[in-house]
């Protein structure tokens, strides 16, 4: 099976257009594609005006779904900006629901042939809930200043508040447990984990290797988890705006971000990456 991969497209900075030259069966959109609040119900009659940005985003998803048999989309951190953590994924499912081959995953799976994709943001564990990291990252990263969390309870009650580093660590734990239970005992099946935040410190550029606290907002240390689950053959992520491609046991870990067009040099030379599983 051929799998094409891109993350961190950041359509708010500029459009991106690419073809399926490799004949990939699946395209992975690994988060930070666009901000949820900027995309509304599709109106092909309104191509300018206040919905111009929204229609650009719809056009991007439409092109992807026309050129690739299947498209998997998981949200990153930026999709939530200026919105509510609890409503981001439902909003995308609502406004993009007209695309039948677009699979939006959040702690969910989708299977094609003998490969099961496990998708979700996979926030970090904040350096295993290190107190300094939980405190400092809340001040250092926009994620915890411009994302609300309505904290709805099962009976429908809720209270206003910001999305916090503790919320992120809790969501990390829930995602890891979902992966664990999904792959448990299924050694005859191939699994691909599609996340946004990195599962390993190996996805850290050398210039940042000594920044313990900040790295806690970008990656976790799931190397042993990956080694303990050899049925996971591929793990994709984004978030770092750096290319990575390495092995942890039988699992290939790959990151292929576009980045900020007109702001990062890598974005001007970015190319779609295709893998085989």
Predicted region positions:
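Active-site-proximal loop/helix segment associated with metal-binding centers of metalloenzymes
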Residues: 118-192, 197-209
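Active-site-proximal segments of metal-dependent phosphoesterases and phosphodiesterases across multiple
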Residues: 41-56, 160-174, 186-231, 262-264
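Binuclear metal-dependent phosphoesterase catalytic core
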Residues: 205, 214-233, 240-277
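Active-site neighborhood of phospho(di)ester-bond hydrolases with catalytic His/Asp-centered motifs
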Residues: 5-7, 27-32, 72-77, 103-107, ...
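A basic- and aromatic-enriched beta-loop-alpha substructure that forms the phosphate/nucleotide-
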Residues: 70-144
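N-terminal active-site segment of His-dependent metallophosphoesterases
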Residues: 1-73, 80-87, 158, 165
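Beta-strand-turn-beta hairpins that frame and shape the catalytic cleft
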Residues: 1-4, 109-119, 189-190, 247-252
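Active-site environment of divalent metal-dependent phosphoester hydrolases
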Residues: 10-16, 34-38, 78-88, 109-111, ...
């Amino acid at each position: 099976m051929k799998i094409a991969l891109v993350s961190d497209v950041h359509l708010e900075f500029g459009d991106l257009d690419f073809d399926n030259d490799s004949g990939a069966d699946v395209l992975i959109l690994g988060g930070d594609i666009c901000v949820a609040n900027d995309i509304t119900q599709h109106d092909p009659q309104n191509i300018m005006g206040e919905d111009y940005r929204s229609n650009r985003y719809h056009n991007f998803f439409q092109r992807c779904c026309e050129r690739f048999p299947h498209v998997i989309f998981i949200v990153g951190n930026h999709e939530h900006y200026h919105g509510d953590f609890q409503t981001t994924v439902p909003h995308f499912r609502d406004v993009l629901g007209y695309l039948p081959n677009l699979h939006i995953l959040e702690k969910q799976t989708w299977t094609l042939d003998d490969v099961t994709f496990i998708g979700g943001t996979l926030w970090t564990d904040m350096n295993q809930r290190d107190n300094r990291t939980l405190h400092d990252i809340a001040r250092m990263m926009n994620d915890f200043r411009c994302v609300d969390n309505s904290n709805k309870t099962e009976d429908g009650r809720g209270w206003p508040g910001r999305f916090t580093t503790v919320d992120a660590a809790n969501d990390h734990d829930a995602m890891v447990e979902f992966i664990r239970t999904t792959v448990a005992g299924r050694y005859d099946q191939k699994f691909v984990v599609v996340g946004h935040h990195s599962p390993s410190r190996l996805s850290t550029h050398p210039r940042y290797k000594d920044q313990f606290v900040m790295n806690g907002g970008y990656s976790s240390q799931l190397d042993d988890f990956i080694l303990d689950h050899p049925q996971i053959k591929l793990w994709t992520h984004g978030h770092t705006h750096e290319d990575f491609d390495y092995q942890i046991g039988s699992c290939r870990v790959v990151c292929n971000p576009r980045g900020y067009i007109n702001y990062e040099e890598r974005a001007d030379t970015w190319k779609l990456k295709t893998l085989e599983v």
